[in-house]
Regions:
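Conserved catalytic core of the tyrosine transesterase superfamily
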Residues: 1-305
Length: 305
């Protein structure tokens, strides 16, 4: 988040309130010790920095009523950032106050209802058009990989060349969102394209090299590839890179995979998260029947609704 001045909002907050630099350092230490997500931390810090710049003080130096009035103003302002940004502001302040050992009862931050919006799914025709849109082989491979294995953006940029096992046709996802490794199938169709990509690009260590300090690609870069590719198609749906993961899950359900297996493939912590795809998957309905008929293969075409 970089303002017209050329300084990020965090840099502006530190310049205005120098003590905020110690806060950033303390938050970073806590997230590292707890093994929590760095991307979530960065979102929290940016939102807390906005609050610091607005008031010119650290959050614990601000009257709780002032903070709540500020949040109400943000929620009502049509020019305010997205609901996701607002949530990061609230969650970030909660995390900050817990870290400072402040009384929860003194800070009546709003409780946020979870979004019940159903995921937007791309159909097979749209997916084929999307995968054919990028000019660069690297970009075509990236988009196809996300859909083929249902990966999160962070999981894609974390992939190393050694995580791809062409012989066993598997992809090793290491330390994903919930710090758990998992193995997902490598599409045979994608495998041949990956080999061509590796031969042409000759990446080192990371499967997708980029301009990040450690040499890997960035999630922002992935999102840019998705946006630019969408522009080259006739797709009018409001989709993002994560829509490819949604499409993967929905299409697997429609192809008959059971929801427990899908949960493991997606790396969800709870099956409740996975169950949202039951609302968008167009699975064929089967009439109630006796298992005895299946036992003796006594079925009729009328079984299907």
């Amino acid at each position: 988040m970089r303002k017209k001045s050329g300084f990020t909002i965090v840099e502006q907050a530190i310049a205005l309130v120098p003590e905020f630099e110690n806060v950033v350092r303390k938050l970073d230490q806590q997230v590292t010790l707890r093994g929590q997500s760095k991307s979530t931390l960065n979102n929290y810090i940016r939102r807390i920095a906005l609050c610091v710049v607005h008031f010119g003080r650290l959050p614990e130096q601000i009257d709780p009523e002032e903070i709540n009035e500020y949040l109400v103003g943000l929620a009502r302002d049509p020019k305010s950032p997205s609901r996701s940004s607002f949530k990061h502001m609230v969650y970030g302040l909660r995390y900050y106050f817990r870290l400072m050992g402040m009384n929860k009862n003194a800070i009546a931050l709003p409780s946020l209802k979870k979004d019940t919006k159903l995921p937007i799914i791309l159909n097979t025709k749209e997916l084929k058009a999307l995968f054919a849109a990028p000019t660069l082989l690297k970009h075509r491979i990236v988009l196809t990989l996300v859909y083929s294995a249902g990966l999160r953006g962070q999981e894609v940029i974390n992939l190393k060349i050694s995580d791809i096992d062409f012989e066993r046709k598997t992809i090793h996802i290491r330390q994903s969102k919930f710090k758990k490794d998992r193995i997902v199938p490598l599409s045979e169709y994608l495998a041949s394209g990956l080999k061509k990509y590796l031969q042409a690009e000759n990446p080192h260590i990371w499967l997708f090299n980029g301009k990040e300090p450690d040499g890997r690609y960035s999630v922002k870069g992935l999102s840019w590839v998705m946006r630019e590719s969408i522009k080259k198609t006739s797709i009018s749906k409001e989709v993002s890179l994560h829509s490819l993961r949604h499409s993967y899950a929905t299409h697997l359900l429609e192809q008959g995979i059971n929801i427990v297996t899908l949960k493991e493939l997606l790396g969800h912590a709870s099956i409740i998260t996975t169950m949202i795809y039951l609302h968008v998957a167009q699975c064929p309905l089967i009439k109630p029947h006796s298992p005895l008929d299946r036992l003796y293969n006594f079925t009729k075409d009328e079984d299907k609704v």
